[in-house]
């Protein structure tokens, strides 16, 4: 399954020069733990970083810095790690694990932001798939047991 099929398409975004306070207000308003910082290039939004609530807590609040002055781009991750929407779930999990991140911007072939994928989204998907598989296995076991009973009673 392509990650583009399960990513969240409504992404909270901001430019890297917004203040940390504005970024935090966006997170609160939209009930999210991160925002994707973007650059506009030819009318397209290209992810340049991701700012998390943890970044704010550790790099601003804990140090007593002024969130009205500090810019989101100054405390956000310097390396943008993104996934192409055609990437598979296993590949995405591998990148998250290797890079130690829980959220990744999702981009199209041109590098334009199209969504965000969180580890929670993948865990939910896998849990639903495993539940469906367990239900199918249980149903098959019951069917086979019923067939054995029917066949055994036919021999009597």
Which residues does each PLM region occupy?
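Tandem CBS (Bateman) regulatory domains
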Residues: 1-9, 48-84, 88-97, 118-156
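Context-gated lysine
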Residues: 15, 21, 44-46, 78, ...
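The conserved cystathionine-beta-synthase
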Residues: 13-32, 38-39, 83-100, 107, ...
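A glycine-centered beta-loop-beta connector
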Residues: 27-30, 35-55, 96, 104-120
């Amino acid at each position: 399954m392509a990650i583009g099929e399960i990513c969240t398409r409504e992404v909270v975004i901001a430019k890297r020069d917004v203040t940390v306070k504005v970024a935090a207000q966006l997170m609160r308003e939209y009930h999210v733990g991160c925002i994707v910082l973007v650059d506009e290039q030819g009318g397209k939004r290209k992810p340049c970083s991701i700012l998390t609530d943890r970044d704010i807590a550790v790099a601003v609040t804990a140090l007593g810095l002024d969130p009205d002055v500090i810019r989101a781009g100054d405390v956000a991750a310097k390396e943008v790690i993104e996934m192409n929407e055609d990437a598979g779930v296993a590949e995405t999990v591998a990148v998250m694990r290797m890079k130690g991140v829980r959220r990744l911007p999702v981009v199209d072939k041109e590098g334009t932001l199209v969504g965000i994928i969180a580890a929670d989204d993948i865990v939910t998907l896998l849990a639903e798939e495993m539940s469906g598989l367990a239900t199918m296995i249980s149903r098959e076991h019951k069917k086979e047991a019923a067939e054995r009973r029917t066949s055994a009673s036919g021999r009597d």
